[in-house]
Amino acid sequence: MILARLVLLCLLVQAPVVEALERGPEGSIVEQTTVEKIYRGVVFAEVDDIPLSLDVYLPKKKGSRPHLVVFFHGGSWRSGSKESCQVRWLVRHGYAVASVGYRKSHAAKFPVILHDCKGAIRFLRARADALGFQAERVAVAGASAGGHLALLLATTGGVEELEGSVGGHLEYSSRVQLGLGMYSPTDLHHDAITAPDRWDKPASSLFQLLGGKPSEKVALVRKASVTSHITSDDPPVLFLVGGADQPQRIEHGKRLKAAYDKAGLQAVLQIIPGAGHGGPEFRDEQRAALILEMLDKELAGRP
């Protein structure tokens, strides 16, 4: 009982305390806590009169403007929320974090969902000064389906047919400089041709993402596969997956690593012993150190 109370006390001491609320840009609410400045509900685009929004978390410590990490939540492309931001802990290490809300597969199929994500990157670059971060070099991260979108952003920079125009700001680039995927699908084409009995069902997440049977949408499922787009100008990527997750998710990481190796690019694959589909192991001391090392190198230019 005493130990439990001590743990609870530590959590309470570390938790951010809300100090003030005010109005911010693009319809947002600005929330000031003891450790963060938060812009909630920043509208980055409107599609058919429906606003798409994101949240921005900034470290409160004074100094140079922080570098930006953009997060995309999971949920099989059909559920989930930007409130589920699994890399918010990076704010305590001096990084700005944006968590993006994108349309789900009941309202938007591929590649429109990716267009939302690219639109968010362009918007964040366009509004970097107003929101208070650096966006010349940007990292993206995501969990599960969100990791798939993050890794697509990393590997489709400059692919015009996948750019879209959501939110405008087409004078800004959607290219990113580092990709982090956590237990994410990377080779949807492989899944579609090896397990059609599973993925051709209307209830499957891949069927709903593509708007039909994957086995009958071969060209589209190739475009939706991260491994289809890897070229020599792609940025480094980090892929984390649990050793106790489904074998196919581990294979996705291995196929991504193999494709990157073949292209002569940097891909770090870590299979975390005993971890499942998510959990605290993905932000433990060892993983946090690795993520920070790659961010410091690729965004801040620190060796």
Regions from the PLM with identified roles:
Residues Q246-R255:
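Conserved alpha/beta-hydrolase "acid-adjacent" motif
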